[in-house]
């Protein structure tokens, strides 16, 4: 399976499928739909059943059950890559028998174990890197490659007992819309796993509670030559507001179970300016306190203004899936055992972000997240270990086996 997995992955990452948060259509970019069409043809040629591509860009398929009485489970990955960094003209480098040295990425960049010490875990392994001009696309084309490789193996080995297995590849996960048009009843699984994690062994069923806050500064524009006592510069108002945000309460100042405020966009002119923050916290009570605190800060800021004003609008994005998964401990137990069976120590940790699984869990499909084998997603230093990808394939296969064994026990 190693060569098929590698060839599949290298083929997929050459297709630029960045999503576009400014486009409200689904998928947000035509390239995602074209990629889904190619995958549909591949799944049909490989013998998958019920291969269907929706008009919103969701591709689903099935592996038929080989025994009765076993729950239908699913595996999910996403078609898009992050809009944060170029996904075009991906030129991967294969580093066989990695020796622990820094890896040159094109002419000007390096991938160094001094900056990324986790590279030293992969001595003697095969690494796949970028050439420094793009992201790699392992998030989540590694997940797609691993799911197809694993489930094709099960198709070719009907002697292995398992229930019906569903897969779905979703668009626009990177812009938070991957679950928008996901049809949970049609998918038909009792639970699922997103294959969208990072390093070898990761198993995640906690994620941030998430919201977006848009703060609009309302100023007053006029000719600068006659501005005295009249002009109110909305950009200055916005800048002063942000300057008084807590310095430690940011992504770069937080880790583990810490939450944060993150200014992701600042734009405007004299008349009107806009600050966009994302709000994150694992604890629901602290999450609500963060939203209240920011709202009160706006009110307090307005109270000190003579001219101009700030307005705030907060929209919830997703919630911590832990609350929806803990009532079904067997979902985690099976995945943990499958990882352990491969000689890998499960790395159970919170996701400092979100996945399709977080929203799907609240839509009635409990859906923890499993590793792909990659590191440094969304940038030019992204890399993935081929042997870790192989382990992910083995974990997927073993989850299907263990689900059947548990039901028969």
From Swiss-Prot:
Pfam families in the record: M20_dimer (PF07687), Peptidase_M20 (PF01546)
Keywords, alphabetical: Aminopeptidase, Cytoplasm, Hydrolase, Metal-binding, Metalloprotease, Protease, Zinc
Residue spans crossing the bilayer: none
Top-level taxonomic group: Bacteria
InterPro entries in UniProt: ArgE/DapE_CS, Bact_exopeptidase_dim_dom, Peptidase_M20, Peptidase_M20_dimer, Peptidase_M20B
Co-factor requirement: Zn(2+)
Catalytic activity: Release of the N-terminal residue from a tripeptide
Active site: 80, 173 (proton acceptor)
GO cellular component, one term: cytosol
GO MF: metallopeptidase activity; tripeptide aminopeptidase activity; zinc ion binding
GO biological process: peptide catabolic process; proteolysis
Sites where the protein binds Zn(2+) 1: 78, 139, 196
UniProt keyword annotation of Cell wall biogenesis/degradation present: no
Enzyme class: hydrolase
Intracellular or extracellular location(s): Cytoplasm
Cofactor note (record): Binds 2 Zn(2+) ions per subunit.
Entry EC number(s): 3.4.11.4
Binding residues annotated for Zn(2+) 2, in chain numbering: 139, 174, 378
Signal peptide start and end residues: none
UniProt-listed PANTHER family: PEPTIDASE T (PTHR42994:SF1)
Function: Cleaves the N-terminal amino acid of tripeptides.
Family: Belongs to the peptidase M20B family.
Protein known as: Peptidase T
Organism whose genome encodes this protein: Shewanella sediminis (strain HAW-EB3)
Name of encoding gene: pepT
